[in-house]
C-alpha cells in the first residue's frame, strides 16, 4: 500500500473514513495523509485496515516513498508508520509483522525490510548478496529483495534462476515485479530448464522452514543474524573480507550465490569462495573441500555454492503442500564431525513464546572410532505439534554402513535403512515428540572425492566444442602417469576458461583433502 496518497473517494472505506474525519462523503474530498493527526491515525486503522484484517489479511506492505518530512519537525513519516502499524497489529494478541522500506539506521526494530524497485540486471544481482549480509552490521537481519528484479533491464532465464537461488538462501524469499504483464516472476514465465530449476529451489525453500525458523529464534535470543559476513567468525582472516558475496546462512551453512554468467564453453559459471578452517561439503554436488583458502567453484545452472560445515545438522520439512505448520515428517541432513543443533518450534502466531510456550528438540552428532552417532532429545509435547512425528536421518557424507542401530528409551527401534545415492538414510516409524532417539552407524564408508582423472573426464564430457579436439586433448591427459603430470598437462593443453574449470571446479584438482 501507498499511505502517502491518503484515502480517496473511490476506496471502499472512504464514506466511513470521511464521516469519522467530519467530512461530507458526497463532496468526495480526498482525506490527506497526516501522521501527526491522532484523529487521522485512528481513522486510518479503523476504516482502511481493520476490516481487511477481519477478512484474513495477515500483514501489510508499507511502500512509503515520499521522504522524511512531516508536520512535526524531526518526525520521519515512515518511522511513525512502522511504529503505529507494529503497535496496532498486536491488538489481536498476534505477533506484529510488517514489510517496509528502509528508514535509516535503527529502523530494523519494526519491519522486514525490502530494497526497493531494483533493475533486472546482473550488476544489481551481484550487489545483493553483499548488501544482505553486511546489513547485519547495523542490526538489519531480515531483509528481502524483489527476486528476479523489479523493472526495466532484460528478460534473462539464466539471471532469473541465479536470482531465485539467492532468494532461497536469503532471509526472506519474495518473487516480485512491476505491474507489467510481460515481467511476471513465476517460474512458468521462463524457459523449461529455468522453470524446472526454479521450481526445485522454491520447493527447497519450503523444506528449509524448520531450519529458518530455528535461526529466527537464534536471532531473537542471541542476536545472531541468519546471513552474516564471513569475517564475523574469522576476523583475522583476509580472505573472509575479500569474499564479498560469501556469508554464513545460519549456524550450519556457508553460501556464495552465483552472480556471473555461464561460460559458453564450460557450461558453468565460476564463483570464488573463501572457506574457513575445516572440512566443507558442497550440499548439491557432494564434493569435499579443505578450508582456510579460496576455492573456485564452477556451477551448472542447477547448482550453486552451498557448503555444510563438518558436524552440520540441517532440519528439513518433508510435508507436502503449502502449509507452514510444524511438520509431521522431519528430515535431518547430517554431516560427519562433531556438532549440535537446536530445533525450535512454537505456535507461529501468538506471543506465548515470551512466557516459555515453545518446544526445543536438541540434536548432537559425534564421530566414533569406526562410525558416527546421532542423539535426539525430544521436545515438549504441545497442541501445535503433531501427536506423532516421523524422523528421517540422512547421513549425507556416509556412503555405507556395515550395521545401524537405533534406540529409544532403552528399546531397539525397527527402521528402514538405505544407502542409495551415495548416502545412508535411516527412516523411523512415527514417534511421540518427546521420545529420545539414539542412532549409531558402525563400520562406515565415508564419502570421498572422485579420482582426479575421473573428475577431469566428467568435466570435459560436458564442455561445448569440437568433439575431435576435445578427444585429442583428453587422450593426452589420460596418458599422464600421475596426478602431478595430469595437473601439468591441463595447464599446457587447454585455454584459460577450460583450465580454470578443470583446475578449480569441474575436475577439482585442488579440492581433494
Residue ranges and their predicted role:
Residues 244-245, 271, 361-363, 415:
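Residue-level detector of beta-strand structural context in well-folded domains
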Residues 276, 300, 309, 368-370, ...:
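Structural motif
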Residues 112-113, 248, 254-256, 272, ...:
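Ordered hydrophobic segments in well-structured contexts
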Residues 273-288, 395-419:
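Proteolytic-maturation and junctional protease-sensitive modules
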Residues 308-411, 428-513:
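Accessory, solvent-exposed terminal regions and/or long lumenal/extracellular loops of proteins
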Amino acid at each position: 500500500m501507498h499511505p502517502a496518497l491518503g484515502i480517496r473517494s473511490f476506496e471502499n472505506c472512504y464514506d466511513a473514513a470521511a464521516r469519522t474525519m467530519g467530512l461530507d462523503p458526497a463532496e468526495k474530498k480526498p482525506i490527506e495523509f497526516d501522521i501527526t493527526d491522532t484523529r487521522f491515525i485512528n481513522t486510518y486503522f479503523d476504516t482502511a485496515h481493520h476490516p481487511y484484517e477481519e477478512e484474513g489479511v495477515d500483514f501489510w506492505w508499507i511502500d512509503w516513498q515520499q521522504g522524511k518530512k512531516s508536520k512535526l519537525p524531526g518526525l520521519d513519516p515512515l518511522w511513525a508508520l512502522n511504529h503505529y502499524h507494529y503497535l496496532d497489529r498486536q491488538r489481536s494478541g498476534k505477533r506484529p509483522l510488517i514489510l517496509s522500506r528502509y528508514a535509516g539506521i535503527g529502523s530494523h526494530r519494526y519491519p522486514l525490510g525490502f530494497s526497493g524497485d531494483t533493475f533486472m540486471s546482473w550488476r544489481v544481482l551481484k550487489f545483493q548478496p553483499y548488501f544482505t549480509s553486511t546489513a547485519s552490521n547495523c542490526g538489519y537481519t531480515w531483509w528481502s529483495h524483489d527476486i528476479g528484479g523489479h523493472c526495466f533491464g532484460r528478460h534473462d532465464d539464466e539471471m532469473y534462476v541465479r536470482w531465485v537461488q539467492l532468494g532461497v538462501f536469503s532471509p526472506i524469499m519474495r518473487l516480485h515485479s512491476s505491474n507489467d504483464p510481460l515481467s511476471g516472476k513465476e517460474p512458468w514465465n521462463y524457459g523449461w530448464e529455468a522453470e524446472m530449476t526454479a521450481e526445485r529451489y522454491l520447493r527447497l525453500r519450503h523444506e528449509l522452514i524448520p531450519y529458518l525458523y530455528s535461526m529466527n529464534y537464534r536471532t531473537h535470543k542471541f542476536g545472531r543474524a541468519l546471513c552474516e559476513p564471513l569475517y564475523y567468525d574469522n576476523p583475522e582472516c583476509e580472505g573472509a573480507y575479500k569474499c564479498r558475496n560469501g556469508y554464513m546462512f545460519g549456524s550450519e551453512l556457508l553460501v556464495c550465490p552465483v552472480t556471473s554468467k555461464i561460460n559458453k564453453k564450460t557450461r558453468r559459471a565460476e564463483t570464488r569462495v573463501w572457506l574457513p578452517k575445516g572440512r566443507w561439503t558442497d550440499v548439491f554436488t557432494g564434493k569435499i573441500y579443505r578450508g582456510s583458502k579460496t576455492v573456485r567453484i564452477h556451477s551448472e545452472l542447477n547448482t550453486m555454492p552451498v557448503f555444510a560445515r563438518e558436524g552440520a545438522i540441517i532440519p528439513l520439512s518433508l510435508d507436502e503442500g503449502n502449509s507452514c505448520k510444524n511438520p509431521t515428517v522431519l528430515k535431518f541432513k547430517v554431516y560427519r564431525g562433531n556438532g549440535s543443533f537446536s530445533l525450535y518450534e512454537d505456535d507461529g502466531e501468538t506471543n506465548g513464546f515470551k512466557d516459555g510456550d515453545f518446544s526445543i528438540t536438541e540434536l548432537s552428532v559425534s564421530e566414533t572410532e569406526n562410525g558416527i552417532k546421532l542423539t535426539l532429545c525430544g521436545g515438549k509435547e504441545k497442541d501445535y505439534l503433531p501427536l506423532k512425528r516421523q524422523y528421517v536421518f540422512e547421513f549425507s557424507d556416509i556412503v555405507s554402513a556395515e550395521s545401524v542401530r537405533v534406540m529409544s528409551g532403552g528399546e531397539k527401534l525397527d527402521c528402514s535403512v538405505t544407502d542409495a545415492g551415495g548416502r545412508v538414510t535411516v527412516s523411523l516409524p512415527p514417534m511421540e515428540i518427546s521420545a529420545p532417539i539414539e542412532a549409531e552407524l558402525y563400520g562406515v564408508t565415508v564419502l570421498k572425492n572422485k579420482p582426479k582423472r575421473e573428475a577431469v573426464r566428467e568435466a570435459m564430457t560436458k564442455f561445448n566444442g569440437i568433439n575431435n579436439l576435445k578427444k585429442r586433448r583428453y587422450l593426452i591427459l589420460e596418458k599422464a602417469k600421475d596426478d602431478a603430470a595430469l595437473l601439468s598437462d591441463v595447464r599446457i593443453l587447454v585455454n584459460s576458461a577450460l583450465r580454470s574449470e578443470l583446475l578449480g571446479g569441474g575436475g577439482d584438482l585442488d579440492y581433494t583433502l
